Amino acid sequence: LEAQAHQDVPFEQLVEAFPQAREHGLFQVMFNHQQRDLGALRRLPGLLAEELPWHSREAKFDLQLHSEEDRNGRLTLSFDYADELFEHDTIVAMAQHYVRLLTQVSQQAQLALGDVQLLSAEEQEQQAQWSAAPCAPATLWLPERLDRQARQTPERIALVWEGGSLDFASLHAQANRLAHYLRDKGVGPDIKVAIAAERSPQLLIGLLAILKAGGAYVPLDPDYPMDRLAYMLQDSGVELLLTQSHLLGDLPSAEGVCTVAMDTLHLDSWPVSAPRLNLHGDNLAYVIYTSGSTGQPKGVGNTHAALAERLQWMQDTYALDESDVLMQKAPISFDVSVWECFWPLITGCRLLLAGPGEHRDPQRIAQLINAYSVTTLHFVPPLLQLFIDEPLAQQCSSLRRLFSGGEALPGELRNRVLEQLPGVQLHNRYGPTETAINVTHWQCRISDGLRSPIGRPLAMCCAGCWTANLIR
């Protein structure tokens, strides 16, 4: 109420007092209530007065709600809005919700504001349908699915990199031998094993071996600072670190941690068959450390059940087959690398490994796409922007699917991708590391508007918006 003493300060004076308001606006949303009485105007002698509707074509603010009260107490409400920020249907829905709010509070004066229902019964039902995606739970965990695919297509090429390739049988034989070695070292269900290696066949074999031994892998990016790697080793509680001999000088030593250079092992005497496992869906599959932007990195574990359901949903939805080639280029510290590494190997398609550091080079990515007929790959939006700016990108005719995630996908970038690569599906995906990679998905369209939706929930997930008091 004390602010009422300053209600007559001219707006121009406020702008002078706050220069930043000239560029960003003093405020973005305004509510304006006025009392109106045209009776006196109509009683003027010799003057015929008639009220005409006036609709301004220019919004002074992002959103304005005007309220006019006549002498009988009747209210008339209207919105002005910036059409580059709001679609017409959004404002119509907002108006309906506001009327519903006013109706409820006028009829139930004691109703708590948090209990007001803005949505109609039909909208609530629609929201419930959007928020859940039922699906049969997975029954086979990743090690079993990997082995099943290897038995089905032993001679098919599974892994490709510049200068070499491995078929499914050879890839799994090497991973199985290392897995038996790890079992001999005590690795089993819920035993965490750190791995720090450059993107290479050795990295993938190490990841497969940890999972085949029943353990949970903890990826450490060799490019991380030494003190950060030391913290992750200590915090994770691992007792075994797999790496490559040329990286030994770049990694910290930690008390109680045995470091093994995979490329120095002689494993020919170990069995080529997969170790026998008795995994449960609640056993850990991997632990990925978040970026640590708000403090120390935090290890986030995900289970075999969550991982199996995510990979099963991806295959049911996007249907990779033997004609596909998927490029693995995300750093192993980024959870996108989980599906990049394992989704191709349970579906029989070919996995292409980009070289160390090549994920930062859009020209090199385009060259790899064309050289190996890549059909499927993932970008974070800033790298997608660099890729679509690359002249070679328009020649990437083999592409079928592009996935975007990790940050908001700008509408302008989305439209450029769809226009320049008309034969490509662009999928926007969202999800924190804690939720096993992704929880929502959306196939992008130019008609999506200024913002790219994060979409609807994946199978076995539900999505919604809650207040701080957990009111939906």
Regions found by a protein language model. Name each.
Residues 198, 245-248, 330-333, 356-358, ...:
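Adenylate-forming
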Residues 298-327, 335-375, 442-444:
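Conserved AMP-binding/adenylation subdomain of ANL enzymes
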Residues 24-34, 59-84, 121-132, 153-156, ...:
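Acyl/amide activation-and-transfer machinery of modular secondary-metabolite enzymes
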